[in-house]
Amino acid sequence: MKRLNLIILSVFNLFFGCKTNTDLSSEEIIYAENNYEFDRTIKLNIYSDSTYIFTSSEKDPRYEKIEKFKGFCFKRLDTIYFKPFEFELTDSEKAVIKNNFIEFIDGKYPLRIKIKKTNFPLKEEAYSEKQDSYSTFTFNSKFYDCFKEDVKPYDLSEKEINELEILLIKCIEENKSKMTRPITEYQKQVIAVKNLQGEIEVWVNCNCKEKNDEFQYSILDYNDGGDCHFNLKINLSKNTYSELYINGEA
Protein backbone atom coordinates (compact mmCIF):
# COMPACT_ATOMS: atom_id res chain seq x y z
CA MET A 1 0.00 0.00 0.00
CA LYS A 2 2.85 2.40 0.84
CA ARG A 3 4.46 1.73 -2.55
CA LEU A 4 1.13 2.33 -4.28
CA ASN A 5 0.75 5.71 -2.52
CA LEU A 6 4.22 6.76 -3.66
CA ILE A 7 3.41 5.81 -7.25
CA ILE A 8 0.17 7.82 -7.15
CA LEU A 9 2.01 10.86 -5.75
CA SER A 10 4.69 10.58 -8.44
CA VAL A 11 2.09 10.41 -11.21
CA PHE A 12 0.30 13.42 -9.73
CA ASN A 13 3.50 15.47 -9.68
CA LEU A 14 4.39 14.51 -13.25
CA PHE A 15 0.93 15.44 -14.45
CA PHE A 16 1.17 18.95 -13.02
CA GLY A 17 4.76 19.53 -14.11
CA CYS A 18 6.06 19.48 -10.56
CA LYS A 19 9.57 18.58 -9.50
CA THR A 20 10.05 15.89 -6.88
CA ASN A 21 13.44 14.95 -5.46
CA THR A 22 14.35 11.30 -5.85
CA ASP A 23 15.01 10.95 -2.12
CA LEU A 24 11.59 12.47 -1.35
CA SER A 25 13.25 15.38 0.48
CA SER A 26 11.89 18.84 -0.29
CA GLU A 27 13.46 22.25 -0.49
CA GLU A 28 11.65 25.43 0.48
CA ILE A 29 11.40 27.57 -2.65
CA ILE A 30 9.20 30.39 -1.31
CA TYR A 31 8.62 31.71 2.19
CA ALA A 32 6.06 34.50 2.64
CA GLU A 33 4.79 36.12 5.83
CA ASN A 34 2.51 38.92 7.04
CA ASN A 35 2.77 40.30 10.57
CA TYR A 36 -0.31 42.11 11.85
CA GLU A 37 -1.11 43.99 15.03
CA PHE A 38 -2.03 42.11 18.18
CA ASP A 39 0.42 39.26 17.45
CA ARG A 40 -1.42 37.86 14.44
CA THR A 41 0.73 36.24 11.76
CA ILE A 42 0.14 34.33 8.54
CA LYS A 43 2.85 32.31 6.80
CA LEU A 44 3.05 30.44 3.51
CA ASN A 45 5.79 27.89 2.81
CA ILE A 46 6.00 26.44 -0.72
CA TYR A 47 8.30 23.47 -1.37
CA SER A 48 10.03 21.92 -4.36
CA ASP A 49 7.95 18.72 -4.09
CA SER A 50 4.85 20.77 -5.00
CA THR A 51 3.44 20.93 -1.49
CA TYR A 52 2.65 23.96 0.60
CA ILE A 53 1.83 24.72 4.23
CA PHE A 54 -0.19 27.79 5.20
CA THR A 55 -0.11 28.74 8.89
CA SER A 56 -2.30 31.28 10.67
CA SER A 57 -1.52 32.10 14.29
CA GLU A 58 -2.96 34.43 16.91
CA LYS A 59 -1.51 35.06 20.33
CA ASP A 60 -3.07 36.56 23.41
CA PRO A 61 -1.97 36.61 27.06
CA ARG A 62 -4.73 34.07 27.68
CA TYR A 63 -4.53 31.80 24.66
CA GLU A 64 -2.74 30.88 21.44
CA LYS A 65 -4.53 29.74 18.29
CA ILE A 66 -2.70 28.07 15.40
CA GLU A 67 -4.31 26.77 12.19
CA LYS A 68 -2.52 24.93 9.38
CA PHE A 69 -3.67 24.21 5.84
CA LYS A 70 -1.76 21.83 3.58
CA GLY A 71 -2.07 21.16 -0.12
CA PHE A 72 -0.44 20.93 -3.55
CA CYS A 73 0.64 23.66 -5.94
CA PHE A 74 3.08 24.30 -8.76
CA LYS A 75 4.79 27.41 -10.11
CA ARG A 76 5.02 28.41 -13.76
CA LEU A 77 6.77 31.67 -14.52
CA ASP A 78 5.20 34.22 -12.14
CA THR A 79 2.00 32.25 -11.45
CA ILE A 80 1.31 29.69 -8.72
CA TYR A 81 -1.46 27.17 -9.43
CA PHE A 82 -3.24 25.32 -6.63
CA LYS A 83 -4.29 21.85 -7.85
CA PRO A 84 -6.32 19.68 -7.59
CA PHE A 85 -7.90 21.68 -4.74
CA GLU A 86 -8.15 25.44 -4.26
CA PHE A 87 -6.15 27.35 -1.67
CA GLU A 88 -8.59 26.75 1.16
CA LEU A 89 -8.43 30.09 2.96
CA THR A 90 -9.65 32.11 -0.05
CA ASP A 91 -10.84 29.35 -2.43
CA SER A 92 -8.27 30.59 -4.96
CA GLU A 93 -7.08 28.46 -7.86
CA LYS A 94 -4.06 30.65 -8.57
CA ALA A 95 -1.89 33.49 -7.32
CA VAL A 96 0.67 35.73 -9.00
CA ILE A 97 4.12 36.76 -7.81
CA LYS A 98 4.13 40.53 -8.13
CA ASN A 99 6.04 43.37 -6.45
CA ASN A 100 7.55 40.96 -3.89
CA PHE A 101 4.13 39.62 -2.89
CA ILE A 102 2.11 36.49 -3.52
CA GLU A 103 -1.20 37.97 -4.65
CA PHE A 104 -4.30 35.73 -4.73
CA ILE A 105 -6.37 37.05 -7.62
CA ASP A 106 -9.48 34.88 -7.99
CA GLY A 107 -10.61 34.08 -4.47
CA LYS A 108 -13.55 35.09 -2.32
CA TYR A 109 -11.61 38.06 -0.93
CA PRO A 110 -8.27 39.76 -1.75
CA LEU A 111 -5.15 38.43 -0.06
CA ARG A 112 -1.49 39.41 -0.42
CA ILE A 113 1.38 37.80 1.47
CA LYS A 114 4.81 39.43 1.52
CA ILE A 115 7.64 37.29 0.16
CA LYS A 116 10.55 37.08 2.59
CA LYS A 117 12.73 34.47 0.89
CA THR A 118 12.95 32.56 -2.41
CA ASN A 119 15.47 30.30 -4.13
CA PHE A 120 15.03 32.25 -7.39
CA PRO A 121 15.44 35.96 -8.28
CA LEU A 122 12.41 38.24 -8.09
CA LYS A 123 11.64 41.02 -10.53
CA GLU A 124 12.66 44.40 -9.17
CA GLU A 125 9.74 46.54 -8.03
CA ALA A 126 8.93 49.56 -10.18
CA TYR A 127 8.84 51.66 -7.03
CA SER A 128 11.74 50.01 -5.16
CA GLU A 129 13.06 53.35 -3.89
CA LYS A 130 9.64 54.21 -2.43
CA GLN A 131 8.57 50.79 -1.19
CA ASP A 132 8.51 51.99 2.43
CA SER A 133 5.70 54.42 1.59
CA TYR A 134 3.97 52.93 -1.50
CA SER A 135 2.00 49.74 -1.99
CA THR A 136 0.27 48.84 -5.26
CA PHE A 137 -2.86 46.68 -5.51
CA THR A 138 -4.27 45.02 -8.64
CA PHE A 139 -7.74 46.26 -9.57
CA ASN A 140 -10.54 43.72 -9.40
CA SER A 141 -14.14 44.97 -9.61
CA LYS A 142 -15.14 42.07 -7.38
CA PHE A 143 -13.21 43.59 -4.49
CA TYR A 144 -12.81 47.31 -5.22
CA ASP A 145 -15.45 49.84 -6.28
CA CYS A 146 -13.18 52.85 -6.85
CA PHE A 147 -13.71 52.58 -10.63
CA LYS A 148 -17.20 52.07 -12.04
CA GLU A 149 -16.67 51.89 -15.79
CA ASP A 150 -15.09 49.11 -17.83
CA VAL A 151 -11.38 49.42 -17.03
CA LYS A 152 -8.34 47.14 -17.11
CA PRO A 153 -5.72 46.68 -14.36
CA TYR A 154 -2.50 48.56 -15.04
CA ASP A 155 1.03 48.31 -13.60
CA LEU A 156 2.69 51.64 -12.91
CA SER A 157 6.30 52.27 -13.93
CA GLU A 158 8.85 54.02 -11.73
CA LYS A 159 8.43 57.16 -13.86
CA GLU A 160 4.66 57.09 -13.33
CA ILE A 161 5.08 56.62 -9.58
CA ASN A 162 7.23 59.77 -9.54
CA GLU A 163 4.60 61.65 -11.57
CA LEU A 164 1.97 60.46 -9.13
CA GLU A 165 3.93 61.85 -6.19
CA ILE A 166 4.22 65.26 -7.88
CA LEU A 167 0.43 65.42 -8.30
CA LEU A 168 -0.10 64.39 -4.67
CA ILE A 169 2.15 67.25 -3.56
CA LYS A 170 0.20 69.61 -5.81
CA CYS A 171 -3.08 68.43 -4.27
CA ILE A 172 -1.85 69.15 -0.74
CA GLU A 173 -0.52 72.56 -1.78
CA GLU A 174 -3.86 73.52 -3.33
CA ASN A 175 -5.85 72.38 -0.28
CA LYS A 176 -3.74 73.83 2.53
CA SER A 177 -6.77 74.93 4.51
CA LYS A 178 -7.79 71.28 4.95
CA MET A 179 -4.48 69.42 4.65
CA THR A 180 -1.63 70.27 7.01
CA ARG A 181 0.81 67.39 6.58
CA PRO A 182 3.53 66.96 3.91
CA ILE A 183 3.26 63.97 1.58
CA THR A 184 6.31 62.39 3.24
CA GLU A 185 4.21 61.68 6.35
CA TYR A 186 1.85 59.38 4.45
CA GLN A 187 1.83 55.77 3.33
CA LYS A 188 0.22 55.47 -0.09
CA GLN A 189 -1.95 52.60 -1.33
CA VAL A 190 -2.56 52.76 -5.08
CA ILE A 191 -4.82 50.98 -7.57
CA ALA A 192 -4.05 51.80 -11.21
CA VAL A 193 -6.17 51.13 -14.30
CA LYS A 194 -6.37 51.99 -17.99
CA ASN A 195 -9.79 53.35 -18.97
CA LEU A 196 -11.71 53.03 -22.23
CA GLN A 197 -9.98 56.13 -23.60
CA GLY A 198 -6.56 54.60 -22.94
CA GLU A 199 -5.87 57.00 -20.05
CA ILE A 200 -4.04 55.92 -16.91
CA GLU A 201 -6.14 56.53 -13.81
CA VAL A 202 -5.01 55.87 -10.24
CA TRP A 203 -6.99 55.70 -7.02
CA VAL A 204 -4.73 56.69 -4.12
CA ASN A 205 -5.49 56.00 -0.46
CA CYS A 206 -3.20 57.95 1.88
CA ASN A 207 -2.78 57.26 5.61
CA CYS A 208 -0.38 58.63 8.20
CA LYS A 209 2.69 56.43 8.53
CA GLU A 210 2.63 53.56 10.99
CA LYS A 211 5.55 51.48 12.23
CA ASN A 212 4.08 48.23 10.91
CA ASP A 213 3.66 47.08 7.29
CA GLU A 214 -0.09 46.49 7.33
CA PHE A 215 -0.66 49.11 4.63
CA GLN A 216 1.08 46.69 2.25
CA TYR A 217 -1.33 43.82 2.96
CA SER A 218 -4.79 45.25 2.29
CA ILE A 219 -6.64 48.52 1.65
CA LEU A 220 -7.11 50.40 4.92
CA ASP A 221 -10.36 52.15 5.80
CA TYR A 222 -10.76 54.70 8.62
CA ASN A 223 -13.86 56.61 9.71
CA ASP A 224 -12.09 59.48 11.44
CA GLY A 225 -8.64 61.00 11.89
CA GLY A 226 -9.07 64.15 9.80
CA ASP A 227 -6.35 64.82 7.24
CA CYS A 228 -4.36 61.86 8.55
CA HIS A 229 -6.44 59.89 6.06
CA PHE A 230 -7.52 60.97 2.59
CA ASN A 231 -8.06 59.49 -0.86
CA LEU A 232 -8.48 60.80 -4.39
CA LYS A 233 -8.30 59.86 -8.05
CA ILE A 234 -5.45 60.94 -10.30
CA ASN A 235 -5.44 60.93 -14.09
CA LEU A 236 -1.78 60.58 -15.07
CA SER A 237 -2.56 61.06 -18.75
CA LYS A 238 -4.15 64.47 -18.07
CA ASN A 239 -2.04 65.39 -14.99
CA THR A 240 -5.19 66.10 -12.98
CA TYR A 241 -6.75 64.96 -9.72
CA SER A 242 -10.40 64.68 -8.64
CA GLU A 243 -12.77 63.18 -6.06
CA LEU A 244 -10.64 64.29 -3.11
CA TYR A 245 -12.07 62.96 0.14
CA ILE A 246 -10.57 63.90 3.52
CA ASN A 247 -11.70 62.08 6.66
CA GLY A 248 -13.85 64.20 8.91
CA GLU A 249 -15.52 65.97 5.99
CA ALA A 250 -19.23 65.48 5.35
Please identify what each model-predicted range represents.
Residues 56-58, 84-87, 206-210, 234-238, ...:
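A mature extracytoplasmic/lumenal domain signature
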Residues 172-229, 233:
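Functional cores of ribonucleases/endoribonucleases
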Residues 44-45, 71-74, 92-97, 187-195:
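Short, exposed beta-strand/loop patches in secreted or surface proteins that constitute
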Residues 4-14:
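Sec-dependent N-terminal signal peptides
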Residues 125-193:
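N-terminal secretory signal peptides
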Residues 72-79, 194-200, 234-240:
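A short, structured loop/turn motif at beta-sheet edges
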Residues 18-68, 81-122:
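Lipid interaction determinants
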Residues 103-120, 225-250:
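C-terminal partner/receptor-binding element of secreted or periplasmic proteins
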